[in-house]
Amino acid sequence: MKKFLTVWGLLLFISITSYSQEKKYALYSVAFYNLENLFDTIHDAGKNDFEYLPNGKNKWNSMKYEAKLKNMSEILSQLSTDKLPLGPTIIGMSEVENRRVLEDLLKQPALSDRGYEIVHYEGPDRRGVFPVGLPISSE
């Protein structure tokens, strides 16, 4: 009887400890955001970006550009933070004028500590906005 109880207790202990071990998973988040014509104030040759120049239709200037960068970076910095403190691993972005505006965006205080690297493809959009920018976290 004592041997039976010892074996039974050992089996019970093994089964309890094997079920109580939590599986660990790596969690990644992917987000997408339309930056709605994120243009800088500098004309790019071959692009129809004239309405986003200081003398253009939108009277686009450094103050407006910096405000848009700040607002967009604050919004992007809040994506997925309910699950991941540093936000999404990958953020797809559309309506980005060029790589330079992505670099400016990622230098903003709200995003600068995230460790994002840029994958950008310059394409033939008639408005001067190619729809693909992809910051990817190296963390």
Model-derived regions, located:
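A well-ordered secondary-structure block
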Residues: P131-E139
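N-terminal, active-site-proximal structural segment of metallo-dependent hydrolase catalytic domains
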Residues: S18-D113, V119-V132
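Bacterial Sec-dependent N-terminal signal peptides
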Residues: M1-K23
